[in-house]
Amino acid sequence: IRILYDDVVCWSLKKRFFKEMQDAGIAVRPFLEITFPQLASRINYRNHRKITVIDGKIGYIGGMNIADRYVEGTKWGTWRDTHLRIEGPAVRGLQLLFAVDWSYECKEVLSDSRFFPPVADKGKSGIQIAPGGPIGEWSNIAMLFLKAITNAKKNVYIQTPYFLPTESLVKALQTAALAKVDVRLMIPERSDSTVLRFASFSYITEMLRAGVKVYFYQPGILHSKTIIIDDELCSVG
């Protein structure tokens, strides 16, 4: 068992929390270890991935962290998120992402058949693992969303905890709505970040003006990052 965690997000956890796992034989490592987060020059270079791979054959990916709030909820209600279980060749993509991050942090290469066993096709749906990060000039995920929204014919449904779109994404959503595509946006009425909550609200008027339908999730905190286009393309992160 190997666990790679983000050191800034987990900075407040006691060292004994990780020591108990290490004593049980679990390899636990921080990603870009930080001694003082307030003074760190690399605080923005974090690992925000939520990946679980089992035996190289089963993968879980989405927005869920490992935290008590997913079981106990919050003072505002439930903590709503979306996570997927995948099987088949796409699991190799998840395993590769973890292996690259692990190699970067631990200088250990995970490449043999234990980690990448033969995997048969499963089902008929195509899955693409699209990693994002600060490497490279172009944001492949942002470009994928822009192209998909621009090409939408029937509907665009978006769930996000923080709606902070680029100007190009704003124009793409407005253009789609004005072209009579059913564009719907769901954001949380309450947020775990007051600053980001009000920043998200600042875009609502211009969305409504173009015909985008905006919904507020009220049962609790919405943390899901999901987009569905024409009932054919779905992205979860």
Feature names for model-found ranges:
Residues 1-237:
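Charged, low-complexity intrinsically disordered terminal segments
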